[in-house]
C-alpha cells in the first residue's frame, strides 16, 4: 500500500524559501505535531490530484524541507527557480500541506502514469464539477489555513507558466526512463491522452492503491539553493541530510529490492486469494459457510465427467417415445452449463477434468450449440413472419379485415398492403427480410461445418422448417408481380406520365425479382448436409417472363407516344434499357430470346418512323421561298441523318450480340457421306425427343459430351460460364435438316432441351457457336475441314434465334426503302425548288443522298441481291447529279467547278470494277455524254499561269451592285370566322357542363354511405371528424417514389391501380399521442377547405383514406414542381411572361376568397405548377373557412376569432397579422402575401432578403415598412403601381383580388395577348365566365370599366355567388378544369418562362 510521508515546517520561524514566490499557507503547528507523531498521511488520493492551480495569495514556510537533489545551483536563473516550484509541486497538497511519497512503498504502474501531468494545474477529479472549493482541504487533518506575518516575496510568473517551463524536461525524463527499464510497463502510450482520458476509470491499475514512481523526478532540474545556502550551518545540515536520504533511496540495494517485489506479485493478487474470494461469493450466494460450500463444490465436481461423456455419446432418441429433438439438446446443454458453474474459469475446469479440453468433446458441444441456436432463430423468425403476413400458412393472397373508420368493411391481402405502404424495393430492405436472409445463410453455414457431427448425433436437419422461410421472398415477389400485372393490364390508353411511372415500377420489380432469384440459387447450391431444390418454381419463372413481356410493351408505348422530348433521345433511351436488361436477362428463363426479338423489333420500328418522317416532309413547306425551302429541307436532312445513324449503330451492336451461326447447303446426294464423317470424328447425336419429330437433328462436337449446359447455352444464345474453354476447344453444335432419313452410327446422348422453332430449309446444315466472331470462324474452319466439298456456304453469318434473324431481314428491307426514298427525295426537292434559286440546297441534297446510299451499301454487303439493286439506283443518282451541274448550274461559277469535281469522283466510285459491266447500254451512253460535257466546262476553269485569277479579281472589285425585291404581306378579314369559332366553343362548353353536373350527382349518390362510429371510445371521437367526411374513400392504389417531406407528413407519387391515374399522396402518421388531436384537427381543417374548392388554379383534392396509425390524402400530382423551384434559377425577366402567371394567381385567389376561404400562407413554395405550367395553389393547412355573417353589417373578424391568430410565414406576412389590428376587407392579408410573391418573381430574391432573421423581418413589417420595389428602369410604371397597391399599409384601403383583375397592368395585357389554356371540364356553376355578364366582359376588355367602388363590388358579388360542387374523389384522377378568363385563354405549357409563346397584335 502506498504511503505519504508528510514533512512539516519547524516550530515558529517562517521565511520565504524562493524569491518572487507566491505566499503559500501551511498547516498549523498544532496539527503538524500530531501528524508528525503518526508519520503518515492519508493514502487515498493520487499524488497528481494534489496539483492545484490557485490564484489566491498563500505563504510559504521558511523551514520547509524540500525534496531536492544536492547539486550546485545556478545563480540568477529565475526560470529554473520557478520551474522548481512546479516540478516539486507534486509534494504540495491542495490544502497547503507538503507531502513526499516514499519510493520504497510506491510501485511504478502504467495505469498511474504521467498523463496527469499533461494538463495545467487543477483540482483533484473527485472535487471537480461538484461545487467543492479546491482551496479547502480534502484531508481530514488539515482544516484551517495559516498565514505568515513575516516578509514575503511574490513570483514574477504565473503558476501555469512555471508548469510549462518544466514540462519538456519532465516528459523527456519519462521517455528515457521507459527506454532504460524495459522490464517495467511502458508509459509512452499514455503521453497523448487527453484531459478527459485522465478522469476515466481506465487510468488506474487493478490494484487497490496504485503506487507512484518517484524516479521520474530525479533528473528534473529543480535546484532551489545557491552557494550562500551552504554557508549557513543550519541550511547546510538540512541539505546534507537530504543528500544522504537521496543516496540511500537511490542506491543499488533499494532498487534491487523494488524490482524483486514487483516480480514476485506482478498482478497484486495470488491465485489463492482469487479462489478464496470466489468461494466466499459462492458461499454467500447459497447461504452457506465457506467450508460447507467447498464440500458441496467438491462433491458436485465428481459428477462433471459423466456429463461430458454424455455429451460425447449423445444421440437423438425417437420422438415418439421421448422428447422432441430441440428439448433433448436443450437439456444436455443445460447440464453442461451447470457443470461449468462449479469452476472459476474454463482453464481450471480443463485442469481438473482433462476431458473438457479434448477435441472430441468440444467438437460435439459446439455442434450442439450451433444446432440449438439455429433452430431457435428459425422458430423466432417463423413467428415474426407469420405475424407480419397475418396467417400461419404464409398465404399472401388471404384477405384479412382491416380497421376502417368509416365503418365500411375493408379487406386487403398482404401484398396489397405492401404496395400501399412501402413498395417492393423498400420492403426487401426492411429489417425483417434482411434478418431472414442472415438467418438462412447462418443455417447453411452451420450445417456445412457440422454435417458430420449432426449425422453422428442423429440431429434432424431443419430444412423442412427452413424451406418455407427460404421460399417466402420468392412467393412474396411472385404474388406482387402477378398482382401488379393484373392491375396494369386494366389500364386503357395510358398517357406518357402513367407509362413512365409503370416503367419505373416494373424496372424496380424486375431488378428485385432477379436479385431474389440469384440469392435463392446461391442459398440452394449444394453443400455438405444441405439439400434444397436448386431451382425456383416454374410459376415464378413464368410470372417473371410475363413481367418482362409487359415491360417491353411499356417500352413500345413510350417510344410510340410521340413525345417530343424523346424525339432525338430514342436510341439513347433504348441503349440504357439494353444495358439494364443485359445485366438481369441471364436469370430470366426464355428472357434472352424474347429480349433479342423485342429490341430488334423496337429498332426497326424507330427506323420505320424515320422513313415515315422523310416521306411526310418531302412535299416541303407551303411557302415557296428560297429561305423557307432551305430551312425546311436542311432540317429534314439533318434530323434524318442523326436519327438514322444512331438507329443503325444500335442495330449493328444488337446483331453482333446474337450473330452466332452460319448456314451451309449440303451437296446433292452427299448427305450419307456427311453423316458418316461426323459420326467417325467423335460427334454425338443429342436426342431431344422433340425436334426429331419435325425432321431436325442436333449433332454436337465431342467436347460438349461432358458439358450439356454449354450445349443448351449455344443452342439458345445464352451467356456461357466457361466461355474461354468452349472457345479454346472450338466447340460447336450442328443442326441438320435432311431431305431423306439418316442412319447415325455414332454415340447418342439424351439432352433435356425445351422445344424451339428452327427456321432451317431442308438439305441444309447450320453451325452454331458463341457470339464471338473469332469462335464462329474457327468452328467453321473445323467443320469445313471435316465436311470438305460436301457442303457449300449459303449464309456467312446470322443469328440462330429465328425472330432476331427475321427482324434483321426486315431491317435490311427498311434500310433499302429508306435509301430509295432518300434518293427519290432529290427529284422531289428539285421539283419543289423549280423557279427558285436554290442550287446550294439541291447540291447538298445530292451530296446527302450519295453519302446515305454508300452507308446502306456497306450495311447490305451480306445480301448481293439488295446490294446490286441499290447500286443501280445510286449510279442513276450520280448521273443525275452530273446532269444537274452541267444543265442547271452556272458553269462560270467557281463553286460549280468544285461541285462538278465531287460529282465526277462519286460517279467514278460507283462504276469501278465490274460495276460498270452491270450498266445497260442506254445508261452507259448517258454517262459518257454527261461526263464529256462536265469535263469540257471543267477545262474552262483551269487557270494557266494565273491569268484567270487576275481577271476575276478585277471583276470582283468592279461589281458592287446589290439587288433586292420587296415583300408584300396581305391580311384577310377574319372577324366572321372568329365569331363562328366563338359560338361553337360556347355550345361545346354548355354540353360539357351538363355532362359534368350529371356525373357529379351520380358520384355524390355513390358516396352517401357509411356507418356511425362508436363515440364512447375516446380515440374514435377524434376520428369522427375524418371518417364522417364524404371524401373518405377506399381505392386500390400503389405507392410510388418519394417527392418531398413537409411539416405534417411525407408526399409520394401514387398510381390508381383501377384507372392508372397518377396521384400525389400525402402520408400523415398519427402515432404520437401528444400531437394526435392537433394533427387530426389540422387534417380535418385542410379537408374542409379543399372539399369546397374546384378550380383550375387550385390543386385538385380527391379524398382521404383513414387508417389506425396514418391518414392518406389524395391530391392532384403537379409534375412541374413549385414556383420556388422555378425562381431558384433566377427572376422572370420578361414582364409579359410575368403577367401570365399573375393573371392565374389573381384568378385563383379571387375564386378562393369567393368561397369564403382565407389561404393565410401564400408563398412560392405553396404554389405548384402542373406538367403544362398551370399555376396551382396548394398547402391549405393554414387556411381558414369563414362562414359568411347573416347580418351584412357584421364584419368577418367579429364572428371569427381565429382571424386574430398569427399564421403564415414572416417574410410574406401582412402588418395587421403581426400587430393583431384591424383586418380590413376579407382576404386583405392574402393580397399582401401575393404582392410579396409577385415581387419575388420580379427580383428573383425573397422579400426582406437583406434581413438576417425572422424577428428582424417581423419588426420591420410591424413598423409599417414595405419590401424594396425595383426601380422604374427594371419594371414598368403600371407594374410598380400594381405592387404598391398590394403593399397598401392600411388593410381597409388594400384592393381585393377582383379589384386587381381590373388594374390597367392586367387589362392592357389581356387586350393585347391571346393566351390559350388546355381544354377540360368543369360544372357551369364553378365557371368564372358565366358570373360576368357579356356587357361587363366587353367593358373590361375594352378598358372602359368604371373604377368606382360599385363596379368592383359588383364584380366581387359575382364571385361570391358561386358555390363549388364537392369533389368526386373515388373514381381516380379528374381532368384539369377549364377556366374562361373573360374570353382569354391561358397557356398550354408553361414549363419555364422562356417556353411561353404569346403573340401581341
UniProtKB/Swiss-Prot annotation:
**Alphabetical list of SMART domains matching this protein:** S_TKc
Name the source's superkingdom. Eukaryota
Q: Which gene encodes it?
A: wis4
MF terms (GO), sorted A to Z? ATP binding; MAP kinase kinase kinase activity; MAP kinase kinase kinase kinase activity; protein serine kinase activity
Identify the residues that bind ATP.
Answer: 1043-1051, 1066
UniProt-annotated stretches for the region Disordered = 67-99, 176-205
EC number(s) from the headed UniProt entry? 2.7.11.25
Broad enzyme group: transferase
Taxonomic lineage is: Eukaryota, Fungi, Dikarya, Ascomycota, Taphrinomycotina
- What is any Pfam family matched here? Pkinase
Chain's role = Involved in a signal transduction pathway that is activated in under conditions of heat shock, oxidative stress or limited nutrition. Unlike win1, it is not activated by changes in the osmolarity of the extracellular environment. Activates the wis1 MAP kinase kinase by phosphorylation.
Q: Might you report a single GO cellular component term?
A: Mcs4 RR-MAPKKK complex
Q: Family per UniProt?
A: Belongs to the protein kinase superfamily. STE Ser/Thr protein kinase family. MAP kinase kinase kinase subfamily.
UniProt lists compositionally biased (Polar residues) regions at: 72-99, 176-191
Q: Which UniProt keywords apply?
A: ATP-binding, Kinase, Nucleotide-binding, Serine/threonine-protein kinase, Transferase
Q: Under which name does UniProt file this protein? A: MAP kinase kinase kinase wis4
List the catalytic residues: 1161 (proton acceptor)
Do you know which Gene3D superfamilies this protein is assigned to?
A: Transferase(Phosphotransferase) domain 1
Biological process (GO) annotations held by this record are:
p38MAPK cascade; stress-activated MAPK cascade
Amino acid at each position: 500500500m502506498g504511503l505519504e510521508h508528510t514533512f512539516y515546517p519547524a516550530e515558529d520561524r517562517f521565511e520565504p524559501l524562493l524569491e518572487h514566490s507566491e505566499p503559500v499557507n501551511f498547516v498549523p503547528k498544532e496539527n503538524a505535531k500530531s501528524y508528525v507523531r503518526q508519520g503518515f498521511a492519508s493514502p487515498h488520493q493520487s499524488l497528481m490530484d494534489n496539483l492545484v492551480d490557485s490564484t489566491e495569495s498563500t505563504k510559504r514556510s521558511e523551514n520547509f524541507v524540500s525534496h531536492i537533489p544536492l547539486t550546485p545551483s545556478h545563480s540568477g536563473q529565475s526560470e529554473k527557480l520557478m520551474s522548481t516550484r512546479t516540478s516539486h509541486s507534486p509534494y504540495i497538497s491542495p490544502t497547503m500541506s507538503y507531502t513526499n511519497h516514499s519510493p520504497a512503498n510506491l510501485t511504478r504502474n502504467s495505469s498511474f502514469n504521467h498523463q496527469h501531468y499533461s494538463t495545467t494545474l487543477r483540482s483533484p477529479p473527485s472535487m471537480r464539477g461538484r461545487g467543492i472549493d479546491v482551496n479547502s482541504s480534502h484531508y481530514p487533518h488539515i482544516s484551517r489555513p495559516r498565514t505568515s506575518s513575516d516578509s514575503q516575496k511574490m513570483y514574477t510568473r504565473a503558476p501555469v507558466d512555471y508548469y510549462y517551463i518544466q514540462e519538456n524536461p519532465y516528459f523527456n525524463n519519462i521517455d528515457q526512463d521507459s527506454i532504460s527499464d524495459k522490464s517495467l510497463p511502458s508509459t509512452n502510450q499514455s503521453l497523448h491522452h487527453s484531459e478527459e482520458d485522465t478522469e476515466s476509470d481506465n487510468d488506474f491499475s487493478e490494484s487497490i492503491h496504485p503506487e507512484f514512481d518517484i524516479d521520474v523526478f530525479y533528473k528534473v532540474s529543480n535546484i532551489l539553493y545557491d552557494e550562500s545556502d551552504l554557508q549557513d550551518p543550519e541550511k547546510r545540515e538540512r541539505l546534507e541530510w537530504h543528500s544522504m536520504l537521496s543516496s540511500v533511496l537511490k542506491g543499488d540495494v533499494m532498487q534491487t529490492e523494488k524490482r524483486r517485489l514487483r516480480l514476485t506479485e506482478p498482478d497484486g493478487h495470488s491465485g489463492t486469494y482469487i479462489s478464496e474470494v470466489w468461494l466466499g461469493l459462492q458461499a454467500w450466494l447459497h447461504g452457506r459457510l465457506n467450508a460447507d460450500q467447498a464440500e458441496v463444490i467438491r462433491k458436485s465436481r465428481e459428477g462433471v465427467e459423466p456429463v461430458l461423456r454424455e455429451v460425447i455419446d449423445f444421440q437423438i432418441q425417437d420422438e415418439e417415445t421421448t422428447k422432441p429433438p430441440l428439448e433433448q439438446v436443450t437439456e444436455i446443454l443445460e447440464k453442461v452449463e451447470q457443470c461449468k458453474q462449479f469452476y472459476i474459469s474454463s482453464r481450471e475446469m480443463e485442469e481438473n477434468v482433462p476431458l473438457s479440453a479434448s477435441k472430441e468433446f468440444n467438437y460435439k458441444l459446439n455442434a450442439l450449440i450451433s444446432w440449438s441456436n439455429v433452430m431457435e432463430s428459425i422458430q423466432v423468425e417463423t413467428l415474426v413472419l407469420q405475424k407480419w403476413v397475418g396467417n400461419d400458412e404464409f398465404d399472401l393472397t388471404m384477405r384479412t379485415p382491416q380497421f376502417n373508420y368509416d365503418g365500411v368493411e375493408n379487406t386487403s391481402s398482404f401484398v396489397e398492403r405492401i404496395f400501399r405502404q412501402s413498395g417492393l424495393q423498400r420492403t426487401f430492405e426492411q429489417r425483417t427480410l434482411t434478418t431472414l436472409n442472415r438467418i438462412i445463410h447462418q443455417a447453411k453455414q452451420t450445417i456445412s461445418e457440422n454435417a458430420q457431427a449432426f449425422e453422428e448425433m442423429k440431429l434432424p436437419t431443419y430444412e423442412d422448417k427452413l424451406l418455407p422461410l427460404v421460399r417466402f421472398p420468392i412467393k412474396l415477389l411472385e404474388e406482387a408481380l402477378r398482382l401488379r400485372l393484373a392491375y396494369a393490364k386494366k389500364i386503357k390508353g395510358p398517357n406518357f406520365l402513367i407509362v413512365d411511372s409503370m416503367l419505373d415500377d416494373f424496372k424496380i420489380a424486375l431488378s428485385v425479382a432477379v436479385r431474389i432469384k440469384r440469392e435463392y440459387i446461391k442459398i440452394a447450391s449444394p453443400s455438405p448436409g444441405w439439400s434444397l431444390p436448386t431451382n425456383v418454381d416454374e410459376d415464378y419463372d413464368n410470372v417473371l417472363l410475363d413481367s418482362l413481356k409487359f415491360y417491353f410493351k411499356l417500352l413500345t408505348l413510350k417510344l410510340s407516344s410521340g413525345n417530343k422530348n424523346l424525339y432525338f433521345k430514342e436510341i439513347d433511351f433504348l441503349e440504357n434499357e439494353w444495358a439494364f436488361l443485359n445485366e438481369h436477362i441471364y436469370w430470366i428463363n426464355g428472357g434472352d430470346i424474347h429480349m433479342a426479338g423485342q429490341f430488334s423489333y423496337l429498332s426497326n420500328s424507330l427506323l420505320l418512323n424515320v422513313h415515315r418522317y422523310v416521306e411526310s416532309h418531302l412535299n416541303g413547306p407551303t411557302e415557296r421561298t428560297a429561305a423557307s425551302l432551305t430551312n425546311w429541307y436542311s432540317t429534314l436532312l439533318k434530323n434524318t441523318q442523326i436519327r438514322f445513324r444512331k438507329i443503325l449503330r444500335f442495330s449493328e451492336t444488337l446483331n453482333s450480340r446474337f450473330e452466332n451461326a452460319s448456314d451451309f447447303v449440303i451437296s446433292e446426294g452427299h448427305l450419307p457421306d456427311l453423316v458418316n464423317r461426323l459420326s467417325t470424328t467423335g460427334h454425338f447425336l443429342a436426342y431431344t425427343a422433340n425436334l426429331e419429330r419435325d425432321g431436325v437433328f442436333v449433332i454436337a462436337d465431342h467436347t460438349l459430351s461432358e458439358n450439356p449446359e454449354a450445349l443448351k447455352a449455344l443452342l439458345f444464345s445464352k451467356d456461357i460460364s466457361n466461355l474461354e474453354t468452349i472457345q479454346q476447344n472450338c466447340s460447336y453444335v450442328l443442326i441438320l435438316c435432311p431431305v431423306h432419313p439418316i442412319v447415325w452410327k455414332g454415340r447418342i446422348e439424351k439432352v433435356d432441351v425445351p422445344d424451339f422453332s428452327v427456321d432451317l430449309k431442308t438439305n441444309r446444315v447450320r453451325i452454331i457457336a458463341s457470339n464471338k466472331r473469332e469462335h464462329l470462324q474457327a468452328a467453321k474452319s473445323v467443320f469445313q475441314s471435316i465436311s470438305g466439298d460436301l457442303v457449300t456456304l449459303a449464309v456467312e453469318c446470322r443469328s440462330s434465334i429465328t425472330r432476331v434473324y427475321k427482324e434483321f431481314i426486315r431491317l435490311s428491307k427498311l434500310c433499302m426503302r429508306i435509301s430509295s426514298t432518300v434518293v427519290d427525295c432529290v427529284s422531289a426537292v428539285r421539283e419543289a425548288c423549280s423557279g427558285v434559286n436554290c442550287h446550294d440546297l439541291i447540291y447538298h441534297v445530292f451530296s446527302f443522298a450519295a453519302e446515305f446510299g454508300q452507308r446502306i451499301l456497306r450495311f447490305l454487303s451480306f445480301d448481293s441481291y439488295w446490294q446490286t439493286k441499290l447500286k443501280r439506283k445510286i449510279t442513276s443518282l450520280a448521273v443525275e447529279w452530273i446532269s444537274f451541274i452541267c444543265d442547271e448550274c452556272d458553269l462560270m461559277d467557281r463553286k460549280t467547278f468544285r461541285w462538278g469535281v465531287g460529282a465526277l469522283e462519286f460517279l467514278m466510285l460507283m462504276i469501278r470494277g465490274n460495276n460498270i459491266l452491270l450498266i445497260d447500254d442506254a445508261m452507259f451512253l448517258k454517262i459518257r455524254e454527261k461526263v464529256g460535257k462536265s469535263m469540257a466546262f471543267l477545262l474552262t476553269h483551269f487557270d494557266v499561269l494565273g491569268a484567270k485569277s487576275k481577271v476575276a479579281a478585277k471583276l470582283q472589285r468592279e461589281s458592287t451592285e446589290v439587288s433586292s425585291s420587296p415583300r408584300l404581306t396581305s391580311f384577310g378579314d377574319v372577324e366572321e370566322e372568329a365569331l363562328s369559332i366563338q359560338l361553337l366553343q360556347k355550345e361545346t362548353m354548355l354540353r360539357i357542363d351538363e355532362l359534368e353536373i350529371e356525373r357529379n350527382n351520380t358520384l355524390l349518390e355513390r358516396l352517401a354511405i357509411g356507418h356511425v362510429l362508436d363515440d364512447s371510445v375516446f380515440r374514435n371521437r377524434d376520428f369522427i371528424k375524418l371518417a364522417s367526411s364524404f371524401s373518405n374513400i377506399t381505392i386500390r392504389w400503389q405507392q410510388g417514389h418519394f417527392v418531398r417531406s413537409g411539416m405534417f407528413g411525407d408526399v409520394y407519387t401514387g398510381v390508381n391501380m383501377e384507372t392508372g391515374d397518377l396521384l400525389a399522396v400525402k402520408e400523415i402518421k398519427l402515432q404520437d399521442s401528444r400531437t394526435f388531436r392537433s394533427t387530426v384537427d389540422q387534417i380535418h381543417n385542410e379537408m374542409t377547405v379543399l372539399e369546397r374548392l374546384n378550380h383550375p388554379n387550385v390543386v385538385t383534392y380527391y379524398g382521404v383514406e383513414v387508417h389506425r396509425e396514418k391518414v392518406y390524402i389524395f391530391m392532384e400530382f403537379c409534375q412541374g414542381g413549385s414556383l420556388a423551384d422555378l425562381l431558384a434559377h433566377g427572376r422572370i425577366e420578361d414582364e409579359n411572361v410575368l403577367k401570365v402567371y399573375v393573371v392565374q394567381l389573381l384568378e385563383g385567389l379571387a375564386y378562393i376568397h369567393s368561397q369564403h376561404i382565407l389561404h393565410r400562407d401564400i408563398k412560392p413554395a405553396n404554389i405548384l405548377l402542373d406538367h403544362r405550367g398551370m399555376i396551382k395553389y396548394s398547402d391549405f393547412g393554414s387556411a381558414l373557412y369563414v362562414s359568411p355573417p347573416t347580418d351584412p353589417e357584421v364584419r368577418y373578424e367579429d364572428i371569427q376569432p381565429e382571424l386574430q391568430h398569427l399564421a403564415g410565414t414572416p417574410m410574406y406576412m401582412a402588418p395587421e397579422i403581426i400587430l393583431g389590428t384591424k383586418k380590413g376587407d376579407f382576404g386583405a392579408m392574402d393580397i399582401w402575401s401575393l404582392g410579396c410573391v409577385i415581387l419575388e418573381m420580379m427580383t428573383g430574391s425573397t422579400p426582406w432578403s437583406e434581413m438576417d432573421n425572422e424577428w428582424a423581418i417581423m419588426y420591420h413589417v410591424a413598423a409599417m415598412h414595405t419590401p424594396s420595389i425595383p426601380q422604374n428602369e427594371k419594371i414598368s410604371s403600371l407594374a410598380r403601381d400594381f405592387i404598391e397597391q398590394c403593399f397598401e399599409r392600411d388593410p381597409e384601403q388594400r384592393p381585393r383580388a377582383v379589384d386587381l383583375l381590373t388594374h390597367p397592368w392586367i387589362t392592357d395585357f389581356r387586350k393585347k395577348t391571346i393566351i390559350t389554356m388546355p381544354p377540360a371540364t368543369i360544372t357551369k356553376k364553378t365557371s368564372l365566365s358565366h358570373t360576368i355578364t357579356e356587357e361587363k366582359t366587353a367593358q373590361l376588355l375594352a378598358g372602359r370599366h368604371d373604377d368606382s367602388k360599385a363596379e368592383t363590388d359588383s364584380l366581387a358579388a359575382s364571385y361570391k355567388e358561386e358555390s363549388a360542387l364537392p369533389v368526386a374523389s373515388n373514381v381516380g384522377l379528374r381532368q384539369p378544369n377549364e377556366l374562361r378568363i373573360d374570353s382569354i385563354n391561358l397557356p398550354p405549357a408553361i414549363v419555364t418562362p422562356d417556353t411561353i409563346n404569346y403573340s401581341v397584335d
